[in-house]
A protein has these predicted regions:
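Conserved hydrolase catalytic core segment
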Residues: 128-167
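Catalytic active-site module of serine/aspartate enzymes centered on a nucleophile-bearing elbow/loop
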Residues: 299-300, 307-338
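Acidic catalytic loop of the alpha/beta-hydrolase fold
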Residues: 242, 259-263, 288-293
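Short beta-strand/loop motif that positions the catalytic acidic residue
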Residues: 278, 284-286
């Protein structure tokens, strides 16, 4: 897929207050541009993923000749606001200072990102999105977008996601925030390397939520001769050291806050009332061992949208199942392709 940057001409107002005049959205598309009448598949990514599903997070499903065929469809994925992966956020340059915004960047909500996505859609001249797929945090965007722009989407897939942040998820975000703030270099923000040790700790907390005991700890059990368990700790140190090469602590704080803003029912009479207004053909896919969006949450959620269907994939990989169980996802997704 090809990388693009959309630069919005005008002031962008944020839901929680503040504005910027230099909004940018990084996005990837199929090599062939959009033309009227071409079938459109729009993917919404997870928390720290980027806008290149073919190259990074869903290569088994997206690409030339793959299920989501980039030569057949106009496939697009845009990066959320606040991210470290290209779209406007705290790591972006503040034109008034010539330095990153850091904490001067307005706080971002799910609704802000969805409004930005819709600006991009209009800029590209897309009147209908035949298939919208939201994975994890991307599902937050999909719920919000479907409610605010009913009639635009043909079919929607909500995968390993929720319509409102739960205390369980918000609690992990609170712990991650505490880890970031415990690093004294985080508040100094002399450069984007501030808060790196805190970011490693925050990411380790998040990793706990992405797998379940069977999928993570049983693969990292120490031998019976080991005095102090260390295998899983070594795994965490390796994963977090890789992560901080691509992410900064400030952007991570902002996307965690964005997750905490997720509530499609806010100001709309609650989640049930909001979802009842969705007009699209909706499918829910849940990972059986997902501890962030478990079956006991996703199945009742699916019942709130008239005519929706629910599928559960049996997996030992927890929330990360949506990245790993691509064959099972493909079997459910294939009949819905435009």
């Amino acid at each position: 897929m090809i990388k693009h940057i959309y630069k919005h001409n005008g002031t962008f107002e944020f839901e929680a207050g503040g504005s910027i005049d230099n909004l940018e959205i990084t996005y990837h598309t199929s090599p062939l541009g959009y033309t009227r009448g071409r079938k459109v598949i729009w993917l919404c990514h997870a928390l720290t993923a980027d806008s290149d599903p073919e190259g990074t997070w869903w290569p088994a499903l997206v690409g030339p000749g793959k299920l989501i065929d980039t030569e057949k469809y106009f496939v697009i994925c845009a990066n959320v606001l606040g991210s470290a992966c290209g779209s406007s956020g705290p790591a972006s340059m503040n034109p008034k200072t010539g330095k990153p915004y850091y904490f001067e960047f307005p706080r971002v909500t799910v609704r802000d990102t969805v409004r930005a996505f819709d600006l991009l859609r209009q800029h590209l001249g897309i009147e209908k999105i035949d298939l919208l797929i939201g994975t994890s945090m991307g599902g937050f965007m999909s719920f919000e977008w479907a409610v605010t722009r009913p009639g635009i989407f043909g079919k929607i897939f909500f995968i390993a996601t929720g319509a409102r942040v739960t205390p369980w998820l918000a609690g992990f975000n609170a712990a991650s925030r505490m880890a970031l703030l415990a690093d004294p270099t985080f508040k100094e923000h002399r450069d984007l390397n501030g808060g790196m040790e805190g970011l490693k700790a925050a990411r380790a907390i998040a990793l706990l939520t992405y797998r379940c005991e069977e999928g993570l700890f049983k693969q990292n059990e120490d031998s019976d001769d080991t005095v102090f368990a260390g295998k899983v700790g070594s795994y965490y140190r390796h994963q977090t050291s890789k992560f901080v090469k691509d992410w900064d602590a400030y952007s991570y704080l902002y996307v965690c806050d964005e997750v905490d803003s997720n509530n499609v029912g806010r100001g709309r009479g609650g989640v049930a009332k909001a979802l009842s207004e969705i007009e699209s053909d909706c499918t829910f896919i849940c990972m059986s061992s997902d501890e962030l969006f478990p079956p006991e949450d996703m199945k009742p959620l699916s019942a709130l949208i008239p005519g929706s269907s629910y599928h559960q994939i049996e997996t030992p990989y927890g929330h990360d199942g949506f990245l790993i169980e691509t064959s099972a996802i493909a079997d459910i997704l294939r009949p819905a392709l435009p």
